[in-house]
Amino acid sequence: MSTSSVRFAFRRFWQSETGPKTVHFWAPTLKWGLVFAGFSDMKRPVEKISGAQNLSLLSTALIWTRWSFVIKPRNILLASVNSFLCLTAGYQLGRIANYRIRNGDSISQLCSYILSGADESKKEITTGR
């Protein structure tokens, strides 16, 4: 590849509507940090993972994945990072659901735990009720 073609490719990337001078580049680039945090949480014990946090990550990832195809210019980088965020948050929610159901929680208890993070056994210990 000649230096002129490399310069042309770099100039084209630099001046692109989704290039590094725009939020269309930096927002998805920095959002990869959330994906990497989700990957690192796969090593954490499931009891220490927040259901509410992963539900909100899943929700925003779904919304922004859809939105990245609606906005002009269409932003594939934003769609890709949010797709991976959706996968990691969904996986973590699956881990939480599997753990809670195997330990005897009903579906309603599981939903309550994911939405509020409240654990009835912890309330009894801390409040004395």
Curated annotation (Swiss-Prot):
Membrane topology: Multi-pass membrane protein
The keyword Zinc-finger is assigned to this record: no
Induction per the UniProt record: Mainly expressed when grown on glucose containing growth medium.
Pfam families: MPC
Stretches assigned to the Mitochondrial intermembrane side: 40-54, 92-129
MF terms in GO: pyruvate transmembrane transporter activity
Function description: Mediates the uptake of pyruvate into mitochondria.
Assembly with partners or alone: The functional 150 kDa pyruvate import complex is a heteromer of MPC1 and either MPC2 or MPC3.
Protein's recorded name: Mitochondrial pyruvate carrier 2
Species of provenance: Saccharomyces cerevisiae (strain ATCC 204508 / S288c) (Baker's yeast)
